[in-house]
């Protein structure tokens, strides 16, 4: 069968892709990728993903989101409400262009968010963007490092129905709470080196799994730039862990992605 893979979480607007994005996307097409869901981490990337979607219509699909960690110079800081408020009108303005709200979520890694105040601010920003997703009737593309339980509980409390938890690394019991809520989980090529993640992949039903690269990060070799064409590594690893064919993983995860990101069908 012809390959039809969907990368549900990649960072095409990252500086690492500035010089050769055309070749990167050509290699993705040659690898059988049929659609790319391009997330953002900050407002400076919004225009980039919109332009990429216009240059590659029907192939690159943009998302808008404010990541829980924000750059300030060469450092990262835990997101604050004032990082989000000035740009909220952009979500409405581009509601017809974007396919999801993301990358949003929570990151309680101690060296970034070690105070209750920082964590509370992250939760406020997360909730506000979840509310935007409900207003726009869009799914969410979610980051949940060291915060899996709170992330899933917050989404459930707000009645979120359509969500992708990318590069999920929480406990299997927490993942199953997300499965019961109807959420999806995606895994990048880097998980092929992680036995703990294999246990998680075994437990999550294939009907709740999508593929991602998180490129340019989270490739098999952390010293080499990852790119969307490597998504087959994720596909083959999930197949190996579950003891099924990569064709089945490809078919089911693509259907899952089309269900979750309904605008990919149009």
Enumerate the language-model features and the residues they cover:
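Mid-domain alpha/beta scaffold segments of enzyme catalytic cores
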Residues: 1-266
């Amino acid at each position: 069968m012809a390959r039809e893979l969907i990368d549900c979480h990649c960072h095409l607007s990252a500086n690492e892709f500035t010089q050769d994005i055309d070749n990167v996307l050509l290699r993705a097409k040659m690898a059988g990728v049929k659609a790319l869901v391009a997330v953002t981490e900050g407002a400076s990337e919004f225009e980039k993903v919109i332009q990429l979607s216009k240059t590659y219509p029907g192939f690159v699909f943009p998302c808008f989101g404010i990541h829980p960690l924000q750059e300030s110079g060469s450092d990262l800081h835990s997101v604050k409400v004032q990082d989000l408020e000035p740009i909220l009108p952009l979500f409405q303005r581009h509601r017809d262009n974007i396919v999801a709200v993301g990358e949003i979520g929570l990151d309680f890694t101690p060296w970034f968010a070690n105070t209750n105040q920082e964590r509370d601010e992250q939760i406020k920003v997360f909730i506000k963007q979840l509310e935007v997703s409900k207003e726009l009737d869009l799914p969410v593309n979610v980051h949940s490092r060291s915060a899996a339980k709170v992330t899933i509980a917050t989404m459930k409390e707000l009645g979120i129905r359509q969500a992708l938890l990318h590069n999920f690394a929480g406990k299997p019991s927490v993942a199953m709470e997300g499965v019961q809520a109807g959420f999806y989980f995606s895994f990048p090529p880097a998980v092929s080196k992680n036995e703990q993640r294999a246990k998680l992949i075994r437990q999550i039903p294939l009907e709740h799994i999508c593929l991602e690269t998180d490129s340019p990060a989270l490739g098999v070799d952390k010293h080499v730039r990852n790119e969307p064409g490597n998504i087959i590594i994720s596909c083959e690893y999930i197949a190996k862990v579950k003891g099924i064919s990569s064709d089945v993983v490809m078919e089911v995860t693509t259907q899952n992605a089309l269900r979750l990101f309904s605008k990919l069908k149009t």
